[in-house]
Design a protein with these regions (language model features):
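Alpha-helical linker/hinge and terminal dimerization helices associated
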Residues: 52-54, 130, 182
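Short, glycine-/small-residue-enriched flexible loop/hinge segments at domain edges that mediate gating
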Residues: 16-24
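Short, active-site-adjacent cap segments at secondary-structure transitions
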Residues: 24-28, 33, 81
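C-terminal alpha-helix plus adjacent terminal tail
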Residues: 26, 38, 46-47, 134-140, ...
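Short beta-strand/loop segment at the start of cytosolic alpha/beta domains
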Residues: 11-17, 174-177
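Crotonase-fold acyl-CoA enzyme core
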Residues: 7, 63-174, 206-207, 211-215, ...
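Terminal peptide-recognition signature
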Residues: 1, 19, 31, 88, ...
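An acidic, glycine-rich surface segment that forms the CoA-thioester-binding/catalytic face
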Residues: 2-11, 32-77, 114-115, 195
């Protein structure tokens, strides 16, 4: 996906992007079973191993990874968890199908994820509910908390997103891109915080509980936490 974000940023004929899922989910996040296979061997996944060529690609490419300065609209067609939720939060405008929901399952599988991004982009109580309780927020709950701009029936989702895109295209591209830069700056946090979050997540991943979380998910059973 990183190449998609880069193409949007470089193409002068693209003013705005719409991000949606191709199936029942907007994005299901990381493959935890894949993670469990690596952890069972005492290894890091390629994206977490500094010695692996794929390490610099991060979690698969998010808009913030290429400093995209064009507006994005999330057309949330289904459930979005983990990295899927992070991508939504990096879209300035969001339209949600009435049957969709968002959630964060990281602590359920012994990981941390990027809660600082949620604390920055969401109402703090909503972010805490998602990150600490592994809770879910329905489309109507997201609308009530101003996490999304609009909730529509699934069959009207893309039309609603395209309507927002058309409104954006009426404005000056230079002014819109400047507004996006300010949007990102006012919602940003110091790089040291992201680095600290990655450090904590990796520390947890290499613990016994980190391996147990992924293993329990793969075996479809409740995890047995050991606090180590």
């Amino acid at each position: 996906m990183r190449s998609c974000w880069r193409d949007i940023g470089l193409d002068p004929n693209i003013y705005v992007g719409i991000v949606t899922g191709a199936g029942p989910a907007f994005c299901a996040g990381r493959d935890v079973k894949f993670l469990a296979q690596y952890q069972a061997q005492g290894k890091r996944t390629p994206h977490e191993d500094p010695n692996d060529p794929l390490f610099h690609w991060g979690g698969g490419g998010q808009p913030q990874d290429v400093n995209l300065e064009k507006p994005l609209i999330a057309a949330i067609n289904g459930f979005a968890v983990g990295v899927g939720l992070n991508i939504i939060l990096q879209c300035q405008l969001r339209v949600m199908a009435d049957g969709a929901w968002i959630g964060d399952q990281h602590t359920n599988v012994g990981r941390l994820g990027a809660p600082h991004e949620m604390y920055s982009a969401l109402p703090r109580t909503a972010a805490a509910y998602l990150t600490l309780c592994n809770g879910r927020l329905t489309a109507q709950e997201c609308l009530q908390q101003a996490i999304v701009n609009k909730v529509v029936p699934a069959e009207q989702l893309m039309a609603a997103a395209e309507q927002l895109a058309e409104m954006i295209c009426l404005g000056s591209p230079l002014a819109v891109q400047a507004a996006i830069r300010l949007y990102r700056l006012t919602a940003s946090f110091p790089p040291s915080l992201s680095a600290y979050a990655r450090h904590l997540d990796q520390e947890i991943a290499e613990s016994e509980d980190g391996a147990e979380g992924a293993r329990a998910f793969k075996e479809k059973r409740p995890p047995a936490w050991k606090l180590r």
